[in-house]
A protein has these predicted regions:
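N-terminal beta-propeller domains
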Residues: 1-85, 138-199, 203-210
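Short linear interaction motifs
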Residues: 44, 50-52, 90-94, 127-136
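Repeated scaffold domains used in trafficking and secretory/extracellular systems
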Residues: 54-62, 92-105, 134-146, 182-186, ...
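A short loop-to-beta-strand structural motif that recurs across blades of beta-propeller domains
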Residues: 75, 117-119, 201, 251
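A broadly used, surface-exposed interaction patch
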Residues: 79-112
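Beta-strand initiation motifs
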Residues: 83-87, 125-129, 165-172, 210-218, ...
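Hydrophobic or amphipathic alpha-helical targeting/insertion segments
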Residues: 100-132, 151
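Beta-sheet-dominated scaffold domains
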Residues: 185-282
Length: 282
């Protein structure tokens, strides 16, 4: 009886442009090279249930001290370390949110940006309210660094609050001006720098302690690759070291040496992202 043919399992996702070209995809497992050119594949068991909120439509979350603040369709809830769920209050909207916290003592503030504007709550779980300072224009993203909340505005402006405060000086802003026909879609704090992503590039700003009411940061570098969608970004969170994002050309990039974007995606993955971008560009 002839021996069964060996099945060549892939080492990464390689579906090919057409099924006949593909080498396969790894789903719920990962490949690891070992000695003598061999490799081993480990099963990835997935996740276990930690808490049940009774809500639907996950929109985003943020760890605040020892509790997880989670936004769902129309609501904001808090999950403590024991998995106990508490309702915080209404948070209108269904789209993804951006959240950040500051270091205000004794109770830090939490900023939330939704499709309906900016909202403010705090670590105690106070019901979210519309941003209390009317000098803040309508933002599309928020992050925190060096004591400041930074808010990104679609017209390429970035506003900074006071130190560990919700106050906004109408003069404390800067504008991403390296490109002329792009739109700002995300601000991210990473490794002591502020990354201002637009649809056509990215500006990197550093803290130069510019005096008030001026913007406290100054531009350090400009990256050639923009961001395809506000949520197409990872690695900036605490516990991660490398910034990864899907660029405006549907390629995946990693922040490399000299603040330059290094492309890390193979052509197969680029094609998958291009197809997805046609279906849902967000």
């Amino acid at each position: 009886m002839p021996a069964a043919p060996k099945i060549p399992f892939p080492l990464s996702t390689a579906p090919g442009g057409n099924p006949i070209e593909g080498a396969g995809r790894l789903i719920n497992c990962s490949a690891e090279p070992i000695a003598d050119g061999r490799s081993v594949r480990h099963r990835q068991p997935g996740l276990t249930t930690f808490a049940v909120t009774g809500q639907t439509g996950y929109r985003g979350s943020l760890l605040v001290n020892n509790a997880l603040f989670v936004a769902f369709n129309g609501r904001l809830v808090k999950v403590d370390a024991a998995g106990v769920v508490s309702d915080i209050g209404a948070l209108a909207g269904t789209k993804k949110v951006e959240m950040a916290r500051n270091n205000l003592v004794p109770t830090c503030q939490v900023a939330i940006v939704t499709e309906n504007g900016a909202f403010l709550t705090d670590a105690s779980g106070a019901a979210p309210v519309a941003w209390p300072d009317a000098d803040l224009p309508f933002p599309n993203s928020v992050c925190f660094q060096d004591g400041y909340f930074f808010f990104g505005i679609g017209d390429r402006r970035v506003f900074a609050t006071g130190i560990n405060s919700s106050s906004v000086d109408p003069l404390c802003f800067t504008t991403a001006e390296s490109k002329s026909q792009d739109a700002l879609i995300r601000v991210v704090a990473h490794k002591g720098l502020l990354f201002v992503f637009t649809t056509a590039g990215c500006e990197v700003w550093s803290d130069t302690a510019n005096p008030a009411p001026g913007f406290p940061y100054s531009r350090l570098a400009v990256l050639d690759r923009g961001l395809i969608a506000p949520t197409a970004l990872a690695g900036w969170e605490e516990g991660f070291g490398n910034l990864l994002w899907v660029g405006d050309d549907c390629g995946v990039y990693r922040l490399g040496a000299g603040l330059q974007p290094d492309k890390v995606s193979p052509p197969d993955l680029d094609r998958l992202l291009q197809k997805q971008a046609k279906i849902d560009p967000t």
